[in-house]
Design a protein with these regions (language model features):
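Structural preference for alpha-helix termini/caps and helix-kink/transition segments
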Residues: 1-161
Length: 161
């Protein structure tokens, strides 16, 4: 049971990281609004809290807690309209913290060539409003171990853990 909990926690971190990377791909430079400025303060606090926890006799439980607080705060604050700077700050902090534990090392990408071809074929089917073919291709992508999410910015594809 504890292994399943650990796997679910790691999956949550990968999902968040991959989502932030997707947002960053489509983000534009812009001024930080009130929401983003508040998030930047939370990023700073998470980094400081993480460092304090690790300095406290390697209190890994508290340090991991700071990572999850950051993810929670970022999930509330970030969306498709967030400026690059805010998204990049979250990714940088999350990557730095995760690096201490040697996690989040799996590359975030759209997968192998077969999966990329299926994704392109599905995008074409959707453009042609061929919903049956689109659904069939989605099922095939899912069967290969990927999670596909349709967003305003396009298809977001992540490897299932």
């Amino acid at each position: 049971e504890m292994i399943e909990q650990a796997k679910a926690s790691l999956d949550r971190l990968y999902t968040a990281r991959d989502h932030y990377l997707f947002l960053l791909q489509n983000a534009k430079d812009g001024e930080l609004g009130e929401k983003e400025l508040a998030l930047m303060e939370k990023v700073k606090a998470a980094r400081e809290g993480f460092d304090e926890a690790m300095d406290d006799d390697l209190n890994t439980a508290d340090a991991m807690g700071k990572m999850f607080e950051l993810v929670r705060d970022a999930n509330v604050a970030l969306d498709e309209n967030s400026p690059k700077q805010a998204i990049a700050a979250v990714l940088d902090a999350l990557g730095e913290m995760a690096g201490v534990f040697g996690i989040l090392t799996r590359k975030a990408d759209d997968g192998d060539e077969k999966v990329k071809a299926l994704i392109e074929a599905r995008a074409k089917a959707r453009a042609e409003k061929n919903w049956a073919e689109s659904d069939r291709l989605r099922d095939e992508i899912t069967a290969l171990g990927y999670v596909l999410k349709d967003t305003k910015q396009g298809q977001q594809v992540t490897k299932a853990i």
